[in-house]
Swiss-Prot record:
InterPro entries: CDPK_Ser/Thr_kinases, EF-hand-dom_pair, EF_Hand_1_Ca_BS, EF_hand_dom, Kinase-like_dom_sf, Prot_kinase_dom, Protein_kinase_ATP_BS, Ser/Thr_kinase_AS. One of its GO terms (cellular component) is nucleus. It comes from Medicago truncatula. It catalyses: L-seryl-[protein] + ATP = O-phospho-L-seryl-[protein] + ADP + H(+); L-threonyl-[protein] + ATP = O-phospho-L-threonyl-[protein] + ADP + H(+). Keywords: ATP-binding, Calcium, Calmodulin-binding, Kinase, Metal-binding, Nodulation, Nucleotide-binding, Nucleus, Phosphoprotein, Repeat, Serine/threonine-protein kinase, Transferase. Autophosphorylation. Highly expressed in roots. Expressed in root hairs and nodules. Expressed at low levels in flowers. Not detected in leaves or stems. The keyword Phosphoprotein applies. Pfam families: EF-hand_5 (PF13202), EF-hand_7 (PF13499), Pkinase (PF00069). This is Calcium and calcium/calmodulin-dependent serine/threonine-protein kinase DMI-3. Induction: Small up-regulation in nodules.
Length: 523
């Protein structure tokens, strides 16, 4: 089969969304030839890396890579992948290196196939359905150093394999470690190599995204990034596994950066008195500022504590698990918010939408009706097909907009999967309404308080941040940890949800933040 003849939809049934990143979306897929067979052996994760510009000659792939085969056939070459998105091309390069030098490995995500079309590149990956690392731990009845050592051993095993292939992950954190399945003895897989680099071959992706909690001192100081940078990140993960909080805690982001670069952390007696000395010694070696003095992944695999020989097999203080639960909830909320901000294109969509519908001005009750009709007509409540969107417009008697339905729909179908996010369309229409003051803030807030509970959940906060036009975000938004600071301003009592009073108070404390949020409902 020649280039350009294969289509993802010909071979896979693509279903629900498993997750979103700033530059990608991951969905569950089932191989069509196996739909009636054992689904457990035919289900995959399909990661679509969105391209910023269409290729003049998008290429398909000649055939599927047989599992275990070390051929590079099936990967678009750099000439064939004519895209401007550095992250897209970088991830393809790294995944090709993994296929050639690492796969299959019990602790590294496996890549089965690659497809390319005008919308982007689709990576067909091993499906990890066992949940994130911290989710599994906080749900356990018993948790001890032994369980933590098993986790570290598996991560070190995966890192040793990718490091041997000269790959630096550069974004190692709990959410990038998933269990393969729900079995108690399920292997833990390292995934998401979008920010990775191949030593002496590719340049590391420029910039730091999200929290700096796991970032090494050399990365913060823009020094040389090596495999030892991943070992620092593993040290941070281990510290959290044994205490329930990160090693570097500060009043603001600048102070935290300084603490990291100085390696300024401690083992507080109240928390760490029950933790073994070998565990603390291991953390200290991993969180050494000088990268050359940190142990390698290979050395870690022979460490007595990591092997379980010196890890305490007694249940940890329940307070540690409680803190870990709280930390995990906030981490997930921030991750969702950060991904949403980086995926934002609502500003450009709103300008195009306004050019289509002119001065059509929706009142607040019309926006509410639009939301209600979406939920009533759309099968999955949050996403609409074109025909469902047209039915919504008809039900609302918005007849003047029906001729533009397909064009409006196309603005919001960013990944060209034939569906659009209801909340993004709501926000787009709301942007045509010029509101001010508290009414404007309440409109922003209520638009995403979909269950009318009086507070915004983590998913709803993520949607709200997605609606912020990038052009209006603070100029320092790309600084490490800046997005964490913005969220901290909103969630004043750290309970993982934001009330309107908290939301409004954050706006009043920071006028620049208010300008950012209000920009999402102004033309």
């Amino acid at each position: 089969m020649g280039y350009g003849t294969r289509k993802l939809s010909d071979e896979y049934e693509v279903s629900e969304i498993l997750g979103r990143g700033g530059f990608s979306v991951v969905r569950k897929g089932t191989k069509k030839s196996s739909i009636e067979e054992e689904k457990s052996q035919s289900q995959v994760a399909i990661k679509t890396l969105r391209r910023l510009g269409a290729s003049n000659n998008p290429s398909g792939l000649p055939r599927k890579k047989d599992i275990g085969e070390k051929s590079t056939i099936g990967f678009p070459t750099m000439r064939q992948v004519s895209v401007s998105d550095t992250l897209l091309t970088n991830e393809i390069l790294v995944m090709r290196r993994i296929v050639e030098n690492v796969s299959p490995h019990p602790n590294v995500i496996d890549l089965y196939d690659v497809y390319e079309d005008t919308n982007g590149v689709h990576l067909v990956l091993e499906l990890c359905s066992g949940g994130e690392l911290f989710d599994r731990i906080v749900a356990q009845d018993k948790y001890s150093e032994t369980e933590a050592a098993t986790v570290v051993h598996q991560i070190a095993s995966g890192l040793e394999a990718v490091h041997r292939a000269n790959i630096v992950h550069r974004d190692l954190k709990p959410e990038n470690c998933l269990f393969l399945d729900v079995r108690k003895d399920s292997p833990l897989k390292i995934m998401d190599f979008g920010l990775s680099s191949v030593e002496e071959f590719t340049d590391p992706v420029v910039g730091l995204f999200g929290s700096i909690d796991y970032v090494s001192p050399e990365a913060l100081s823009q020094g040389k990034i090596t495999t030892k940078s991943d070992m620092w990140s593993l040290g941070v993960i281990l510290y959290i596994l044994l205490s329930g909080y990160p090693p570097f805690i500060a009043q603001n982001n600048r102070q935290k950066q300084q603490m990291i670069m100085n390696g300024n952390f401690s083992f507080y007696e109240k928390t760490w008195k029950g933790i073994s000395q070998p565990a603390k010694n291991l953390i200290s070696s991993l969180l050494t500022v000088d990268p050359s003095k940190r142990p390698s992944a290979l050395e870690l695999l022979s460490d007595p504590w990591v092997k379980g020989e010196k890890a305490k097999d007694v249940q940890m203080d329940p307070e540690i698990v409680s803190r870990l639960q709280s930390f995990n909830a906030r981490r997930k909320l921030r991750a969702a918010a950060i991904a949403s901000v980086w995926s934002s294109t609502i500003f450009l969509r709103t300008k195009k939408l306004k050019s289509l519908v002119g001065s059509y001005d929706l009142k607040e009750e019309e926006i509410e009706n639009l939301r209600m009709h979406f939920k009533k007509i759309c099968a999955d409540r949050d996403n609409a097909t074109l025909s469902e969107f047209e039915e919504v417009l008809k039900a609302m008697n918005m007849l003047s907009l029906i001729p533009f339905a397909s064009r409006i729909f196309d603005l919001f179908d960013n990944n060209r999967d034939g569906t659009v996010d209801m909340r993004e369309i709501l926000c787009g229409f709301s942007s045509l309404k010029n509101s001010k003051g508290e009414d404007a803030l309440r409109l922003c807030f209520q638009m995403y308080d979909t269950d009318r509970s009086g507070c915004i959940s983590k998913e709803e906060v993520a949607s709200m941040l997605r609606a912020l036009p990038y052009d209006c975000l603070p100029t320092d938004i790309t600084e490490p940890g800046k997005l964490d600071e913005i969220f901290d301003l909103m969630d004043a009592n750290n309970d993982g949800k934001v009330t309107f009073d908290e939301f409004k108070a954050a706006m009043q404390r920071d006028s620049s933040l208010q300008d950012v949020v209000l920009s999402s409902i102004r033309p």
